[in-house]
Each structure stands twice: as C-alpha cells, then as structure tokens.
Amino acid sequence: MPKPRTKRGHGREEKKRKRREEAESYEAHENDSKRQRTTDENGYQDGQEAQENGIGEKEFFGMLADEEQEYFRRADELLELNQFPSDEERDVFLENVWKEAENKELKLASSQSCSRLMERLIQLSTTAQKKRLFEAFAGHFLSLVQHRFASHCCEALFLRSAGVVTKELSGFVGFVLDTKGAGGDAEKPEAAMEHLFLATLDELEGSLSYLITDRFASHTLRVLLLVLSGRPLEDSSSRTLMKSKKKEKISVSGAEAADEANKGLRAVPPSFTMAATKIIQDSTAGMDATSLRVLARHPMGNPTLQLLLELDLTLNKGEQKADAERPTLLFQLLPGAPKSLSDGSSEASEFINGMIYDQIGSRLIETLITHAPGKVFKALNQNIFLPRIEGYVRNDVSSYAAIRVLNRLSKDDLVQAVEQITPTVPQLVTKSRFNVLKTLFERCAARGANDEIKKLNKGLKEGCGKTPADLVTYLCGFKDEEKKKKDVQQLSKNEYAIQSHGAQLLTALLSIPGPVKGVQESLLAVEPTVLVRLATTSMPTVTVLTTALATPSSNPAFHKSIVSSLLPHIHELAVQQFGHNLINAIAEVPSKGKERSVPFHMKEAIMARLGEHEAELRDSWMGRSVWRNWKGDMWKTRRRDWKVWMREVDAHIESTLPQRGRAAEKQQAAQDKPSKKEEPVVEDKMEVDEVVEKPEEEKKKEKKDKKDKKEKREKKEKKDKKEKKEKKKSKPEEAEVVAEDEE
C-alpha cells in the first residue's frame, strides 16, 4: 500500500518539481542541442523517451533521496580536499562510502551532482570493487554509455580496469566473492575481468552502428576499443580520441599510484583482439560509399572512424594477407586501391580529393596517410599528393595532411617536394604555415638533404625580414602588435597557435647545423625587452631560450650576452610561470668552455639578486623551485660550499655533454676501440653511455683527482716554506750568491 500524501511530502515534491524546472530552463538556455538531465513523471528522462533513431528506450534508475544526495556530496568534497589525518582513516572512509553506495550505483552514476564521486571512487577502487561495479552496471550498459554523466563513469571503469586484464593473464585464481556483503549464502566465484569486458560487449552488440555517432556513447566506445587493442592509454593521441575538450577533469589524490598498472603497452588476451576486429566489422557493415562519407564528415563519427581505421590497419596484419577476400575498412574507403588511385575519376580518388579540404574529413585522411600499407601510400603519393604538394601546404586545412605525407617520404621524393615548395616559402611565412616549415627542416635534416636546408633557410629569411632580429620577432608574433582586432577572443586563440608554431620552428632550427647560426644571431640582435617577452609569454617561447642556452655556439660570447641582457630582470623571471624555467636552465650552463659557457662571476651576480628577493621567491612555487635549484640556502649559510658545488656542476656538465666534448677525451675514446671503421659510431655511443650510466663514477674520480692535486699543492707549499727558512739561516756568502742570481 502506498503511503498517503502528507503536507510535508507534498512540500518535498514541490521542491523537486521546482528544481527540475530550473534545471530544464538552464539547460535549454545554455545549449538547445544538449539532452536534458531531469526526469519526467513517466520515469524516462525528459525528451528522451526513445532513441533519436527509434531504437530502444532510455532507462530511468530513480533519484537519490535528499539525505543520500547530501551525504554523497559531502563525501565528494572530503575526497577532493584529501585532509584525512592518515591513510588508514582515508581507507576506512572509502570503505564506508562504498557500503553506503551499495545498490545505489546506477543512481549515483546518472546523477548530475554525484557522478563525480563515482568517478573518484572508481579511480581509488580495488580489483574486487571494480568487478562489483561491473556486475551492478550489467544489463544497463547500453543506457549508461548514452547518458551524459553515467558515460563518464563507464569510461573511468573501463580505463582503470584495463591493467587488471593484463595482470590476470599471468595467472587468475577465481576467489569466492561476497558481492552483496550478505554472508555465506550470497558468495559466488569471482569472475575474470576479461569475461566482464566481453559480457559488456555482448550488451552493446547490435547497437554499434548508431553508438558511433552518439554524443556521449561515441567517447565510451573509443575507450573500449583502446582497452581491447592494448594500446597505451596515456598517449596524447589516445587522450585526444577518448576525451572531449570540454570534459571536466576529475582527479583525486592517490589515483596516479593506483593507475600505474594501466600505463604503457598492455598484453591482451586473443579474445580481445577478436572482439576489436568484430566491432570494426559490425560498426561499418552494410555502409555504402555515401554512408562512409557522411560518417567521415560527422563531428562525433569521424574520431571513432579514425580509430576503427587505425586498428583495422594495425591489428592482424598477417591475417589480412591470408584473408584477402574479406573487404577491410581501408578498401571500403578506397575501393580498388592501389590500382584505382591512378584514375582521377575513380571512387577512391574522389574520396581523397573530397576529404582533404574538409575541416573534419581531413583528419581521417591524416590517419589513412600515417597507417596505410606501403603499396597504398606509394600510389597515393605518386598520383595525388606529390604532384599537388605545393598547393596542399598553402591551404589551412590540407596542410596538416601534407605534413603527414612529408613525414613518410623517402629522400628522393622529399627533394622533389622541396623543389616544388621552395619558391613559395616566403608565401608560407606570410600565411603563417610555420608547422609545415618545421616539418620540412626536420625531415631534410633527418634525410641528410643539406642543399635543400640552405634553400629553405634562405626563403625563410626573405619571408621574415631583412634584419637578423626579424627572424625571432616575426616567428614569435611580436611584429604588428598595434593592428586592430575584430574578434578579440578568436584572434587571440589563433594568434597563440601561430605563435606556438613559430616558436617550435625556432626550437627545431636550433638543432640543425646551418640555420642554428641564424637563430643565434637573431637572439643577439633583439632588444632585452623582447628576450623578457620570450621568457614570459608561453611555454613554447621560453623553450626557445632554454634550448638556445643548451646549444653550443661558434660565438664564445653568445650565452654570456643572452644572460647579461636578462640580468636586470632575474628576480622577476624567477617568480613567473614560464620564466622560472629559464633561470633554472642558466644554472646548468657551465662556467668554462669555448662553445657554451656563462662566467662564474655572472652566476654569482644572479645568485646575489635572487638572495635580495628571497622572501618574494619563497611566496610562490616557481620561486621556490628556482631557490632550490640554485641551492639558495647553501649560498646563504655556506658560501664556500656553494662555490664548490657550482664548480662541480660545471665539471659534471663538461664531462657529460656530448656537444661540448673535449678533444682529448674524444681521442682517448677513439684509441681504446679496436677498429678504425667503427670509431664514429662507437664514439657516439660512448658519449651517450657516459651521460646515462656513469656520471657518479666520473664525479667520484674528479673529486679524488682534485683531492690529490690539493694534497700535492700543500706539500709543495710546505717544502717551499722550509727551504726559505733554511736559506735565511744559511751563511752570508751563500746569501750574497743567491742575491746576485736573483739580480
């Protein structure tokens, strides 16, 4: 029998109704296209009684009571603050929250205010707790992955459980698990994580074709594919595919240590590889050329299609050769490839030509270029990309696909491409295609195309300006600052991207013999205010200066001049978000050396300025980082030890920097090798090994040598003093002879 409606109950229902109406109006105002989070009286989410394509119905899991909602909200705050007296008390608190959440997992996951708590609990959960959550979600995954908040909980659960699968491959023992915490009657054998993932896939099977384009489920599906494939989950490319840019980052203290098992490449069972292959087949089964083109241009479908294509090209390469009759996704996109690509009117050629200039579709072309088999890429390059490479690099959209092409070209094809592009380099500079120029310089350096580097460098200088200083000021966007802006926000966003690309180009040039000299001359020619702006504008711009300090120069005064220009602003840079990296980099430059050095007296002056502003430095984490790296406390209390430490740093850097290696050491290393033919290769390896494996031994050896020299010097001084005393006591005749000899 239902309880009679009381006055208090009626008031509570009225409050809930008002909250629902407020949430609906807020959501409608914020974004009309967003699905509503509130519930209607019929038990389904408002406006979502059925799927958009008419398949299936949305489930409603109920709402938490006000007291429960308040408890979980408070628990979320406590976890975020992490102010527990000890780890034991924190573990007890987590256990209590899990007990309170029992049988409420679905409500928590689909709650706007409590889904964050569920994500944090998943990040800190044990293997048994993850498996309980899989069982709690079982049978409802199709609805959960399409829910605005629950989909994030599913993603977190899949990501954090990936490492458990790999761990269980080495040997899984199914312990008896009390899933309900109700005693011996409710105990049952613990399921393997592999089986739980496969059961989840069984629920989603049959719905994959429309989940690909779902606003929330598409992200969850990508996460599931990455877990099944065994790919690293922390890669930047993987993160871009998995998460929306707008997604809130939910983190909790202790999650990184718990997530250690999920990092890097993971071994996966054969069933996962088969499941990933089946998802690829089922997702695009029955799609014709038109459907694939629509999917390739879809904002949600394109990233999923990218991942499907990449996995299709990388998984089971050997099996694809044996099963050539089966149409893969690659040949669905490019029918008849590679032969059909020679015909400009073929379906495959039209697909490439239509997608490469599309803002969304071009991303699929990038994936295709990167992972296509050699025969297909060769046909693409010879028939489509190489003949039109000059036009592709000039376009804002197709230039990204052109960069992927340049990264795969052989030396001969690269030289041919550079010959086409070289006359338009000044135009590329004007259009701010700095990322294209960076790729050209890097690939020419990697392929040993030195003549092409000279041509590109000449065109770059023509495009930037006549004076040496123009190279840095133009590429970093410090010219024409007074130009009026129409859309301030959009322009500032675009300008930041252009500035980053320009700074990355300068950083790349500093590692290439030839262009490095031009960048160093430009840095010497700019005003000190420009150097300060480089140090404080962004991470890419300050990286230009830190890389310049780490790079040897034929000009002995280069590093000294840069530091001298920055000296009046040292304390300001030390407390700046980006500038403190530069101050830390100065400490690593040796005090002596022909190619790279900052005099010791200049380092003392820097430390003195930092000491004057010690209180200011200690007020910020950037300043504390600088004070710690420069050993400010040692400088205050033990000045002599600080000087010894700084000289030790110099000696350590001198012996471990390959680019500054002393000629004597190189000759000795070469003499120790048995064969002259192997000298250059082995010599390089020895220098790298010295950096990685033997710094401590060298440091001990240098200390011992210094100690021996000091002892010898002291003995010699004592001997000289003794001789002088003996001479004074000697006969007058001998003293006269000594005086005559001195005259």
Swiss-Prot record:
SUPFAM superfamilies registered for this protein in UniProt: ARM repeat
Keywords for this protein: Nucleus, Repeat, Ribosome biogenesis, rRNA processing
BP terms from Gene Ontology: endonucleolytic cleavage in 5'-ETS of tricistronic rRNA transcript (SSU-rRNA, 5.8S rRNA, LSU-rRNA); endonucleolytic cleavage in ITS1 to separate SSU-rRNA from 5.8S rRNA and LSU-rRNA from tricistronic rRNA transcript (SSU-rRNA, 5.8S rRNA, LSU-rRNA); endonucleolytic cleavage to generate mature 5'-end of SSU-rRNA from (SSU-rRNA, 5.8S rRNA, LSU-rRNA); ribosomal small subunit export from nucleus
Pumilio repeats by residue range: 100-135, 203-243, 347-382, 565-608
Domain of life (superkingdom): Eukaryota
Main location per the UniProt record: nucleus
Stored InterPro entries: ARM-like, ARM-type_fold, NOP9, Pumilio_RNA-bd_rpt
GO molecular function: RNA binding
Segments of skewed composition (Basic residues): 1-19, 701-730
Chain spans, region Disordered: 1-56, 656-743
Function: RNA-binding nucleolar protein required for pre-rRNA processing. Involved in production of 18S rRNA and assembly of small ribosomal subunit.
Name recorded for this polypeptide: Nucleolar protein 9
Organism: Fusarium vanettenii (strain ATCC MYA-4622 / CBS 123669 / FGSC 9596 / NRRL 45880 / 77-13-4) (Fusarium solani subsp. pisi)
Lineage: Eukaryota, Fungi, Dikarya, Ascomycota, Pezizomycotina
